[in-house]
């Protein structure tokens, strides 16, 4: 499905899909038979303002909900072998502002939200299980986009898997490799481009 960006295209959003080596990630990967098990939405290229639904601490996989993510701390910081794909999505200024409003609502009511464990089972059965205040990671990202008028998938949010974002014709892959090397890649890419060179996007 094509995203309607008939207005001035002057905003970017970023979707991070990733695979850690935690037990839940391995289970999800086994169930879905897909390479990535987690999705997050970011407002900036460096992924410094990024949101998702996941565990709130490192050690308890069942204490999950809406979180502000940091690629240098938490599970990402602990698992230095986390692999990822960073996707860039062009949106209108109006759509971008709607995303900000959606995220502000999540932040203001963070204590109400829970992880949609049953929803993961629904994805496997191809039957969406959507409950108020309950989301899994890719359902959350898809819901924020859809409610902001950004239609890039042909699935309802409760059936969206992390890898569905990568398969969308509306996104641009800007990085694939180890998450811990992502910001280094950005710096190197900018430095090399300043001298008219080229740097690979694969940092394995």
Question: Where do the PLM segments sit?
Answer:
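Cysteine-nucleophile amide-bond enzymes
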Residues: 1-204
């Amino acid at each position: 499905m094509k995203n309607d960006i008939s207005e001035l295209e002057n905003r970017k959003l970023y979707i991070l899909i990733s695979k850690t080596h935690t037990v839940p990630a391995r289970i999800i990967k086994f169930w879905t038979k897909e390479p990535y098990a987690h999705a997050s939405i970011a407002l900036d290229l460096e992924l410094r303002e990024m949101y998702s639904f996941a565990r709130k601490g490192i050690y308890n996989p069942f204490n999950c909900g809406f979180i502000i993510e940091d690629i240098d701390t938490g599970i990402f910081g602990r698992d230095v072998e986390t692999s990822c794909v960073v996707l860039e999505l062009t949106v209108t200024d109006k759509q971008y502002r709607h995303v900000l409003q959606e995220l502000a609502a999540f932040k203001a009511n963070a204590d109400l939200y829970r992880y949609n464990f049953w929803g993961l089972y629904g994805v496997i059965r191809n039957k969406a299980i959507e409950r108020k205040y309950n989301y899994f990671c890719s359902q959350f990202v898809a819901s924020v986009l859809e409610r902001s008028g950004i239609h890039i998938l042909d699935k309802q949010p409760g059936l969206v898997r992390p890898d569905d974002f990568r398969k969308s014709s509306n996104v641009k892959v800007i990085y694939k490799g180890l998450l811990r090397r992502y910001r280094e890649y950005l710096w190197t890419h900018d430095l090399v481009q300043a001298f008219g060179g080229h740097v690979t996007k694969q940092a394995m």
